[in-house]
Amino acid sequence: QNKLLSVIAIIGTALAIAMIMCIVLIYQARTANYEPEINRDRTLSIEMTIAQKIDDKGWNMGNQLSLRTIKECFYPMTTAEAVSAVHYSMTSLAATPDGTREVKCAVSYTDDNFWRVFGFRFLHGKPYGQEFVSGEKKLVVTRSLARRLFGIDNAVGRIISLGFVDYTVCGVVADESVLAEA
């Protein structure tokens, strides 16, 4: 009967429903599978280690796993479908070999299993395989980086200098979604 109470009740109900919808959308964005994280719901990520000595109370904490730990503890796992190691580096300067074009970009150092865990859509070329173990300097770039450095989408076979080390582009992938964390 009272119009003011009716308006307050309707607005309160609408705000409650809107808040619940926002919470569900945030949860969906954090947990659903979005390209390239197509296996997000089945992925276990280990991002830091804590080691405690047995003989005393000392301990050590690190935010990155060593390559030795990855090779000895994680690569031999048989229960996991795929095990991949990723090192997220700081922003780096990518340049053409002659230095005429330079672009700041985020660089992730990965292994060959990275391409099995994540579902990047290759536009040109293919991912690197086991050749990275032998020390071949290959990399995969996004379409936007290829365009900014070379002015074209297909940069396969071109050379990019990262930190004064030359790498050969073996693949070009589509730019990732803003919802991706990888």
For each feature predicted by the language model, list its residue ranges.
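Small-residue transmembrane helix packing/gating motifs
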Residues: I50, I54-T69, A82, D98, ...
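Short strand-coil-strand connectors
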Residues: A94-G99, G163-V165
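Membrane-proximal extracellular/periplasmic loop immediately following the first transmembrane helix
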Residues: I23-L93, R101
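Short, strongly hydrophobic transmembrane alpha-helices
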Residues: L4-T31
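Generic structural signal for small/hydrophobic residues in well-ordered secondary structure
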Residues: N2, A9, R30, I46-M48, ...
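The feature marks short, hydrophobic/small-residue-biased sequence motifs that occur predominantly
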Residues: V86-H87, P97-P127, F132-V133
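Mid-to-C-terminal secondary-structure elements
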Residues: D111-P127, L139-A182
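A residue-level structural signature of the nucleotidyltransferase/glycosyltransferase Rossmann-like core
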Residues: A82, V107, K137-K138, I159
